[in-house]
């Protein structure tokens, strides 16, 4: 879903990053080759749809033209695809779009994967927070693709750094967790999470659960595991 690296789109990121964008791409490449190979060993077939994010762009200025070809995310995806193709590993298939979205189907359930920064909406206020913009953006995306003759059951995205599941959309959590940016904007605290769901051949998405991506400090329970009123 993009933003595989923090990037250099802000001066403070350049100052705080450990290494350069190229360093990060090379490190990610090694990590993901192992991860994808391990998944293929366990599941035999692996399909990887991709989308690039806003943090991975090569320029600080936001680009629309040739945006994919100016993205470190997109470069990383292509490096991985070429690696497995050169090793003739037919268990693994990528779908790498040149545009902002990737459309695919699993059985009869249609998905649109996008990073989330190009929903055509802005902001979020009050207690609703980001839910309002996400819901409006999902509706805009669905309407746009309906004009192309494509129906969408689920829009999948990241970008918002919080795990959210609403009707017709799944927003992935963030691996990096809470940071200075989130605190300065008073965003709700959330531990690192990733979205996991199953797609049933007949019923579509039937099971969803957030995967906690942080090993917390073990706590000794102070009370019994179950309590009820006397």
What is each PLM-predicted segment?
Residues 45-54, 92-102:
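Acidic carboxylate-rich catalytic motifs and surrounding loops in phosphoryl-/glycosyl-chemistry enzymes
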């Amino acid at each position: 879903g993009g933003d595989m690296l923090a990037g250099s789109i802000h001066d403070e990121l350049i100052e705080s990053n450990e290494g350069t964008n190229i360093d990060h791409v090379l490190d990610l490449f090694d990590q993901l080759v192992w991860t994808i190979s391990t998944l293929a060993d366990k599941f035999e077939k692996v399909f990887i749809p991709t989308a690039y994010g806003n943090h991975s762009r090569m320029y600080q200025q936001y680009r629309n033209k040739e945006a994919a070809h100016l993205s470190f995310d997109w470069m990383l995806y292509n490096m991985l695809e070429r690696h497995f193709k050169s090793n003739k590993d037919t268990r693994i298939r990528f779908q790498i779009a040149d545009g902002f979205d990737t459309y695919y189907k699993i059985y009869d359930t249609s998905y649109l994967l996008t990073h989330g920064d190009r929903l055509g909406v802005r902001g979020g206020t009050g207690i609703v927070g980001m839910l309002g913009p996400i819901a409006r953006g999902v509706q805009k995306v669905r309407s746009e693709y309906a004009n192309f003759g494509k129906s969408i059951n689920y829009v999948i995205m990241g970008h918002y750094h919080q795990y959210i599941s609403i009707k017709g959309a799944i927003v992935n959590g963030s691996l990096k967790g809470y940071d200075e940016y989130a605190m300065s904007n008073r965003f709700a605290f959330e531990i690192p999470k990733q979205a996991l769901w199953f797609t049933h051949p007949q019923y579509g998405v039937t099971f969803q659960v957030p995967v906690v991506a942080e090993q917390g400090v073990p706590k000794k329970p102070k009370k019994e595991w179950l309590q009820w009123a006397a």
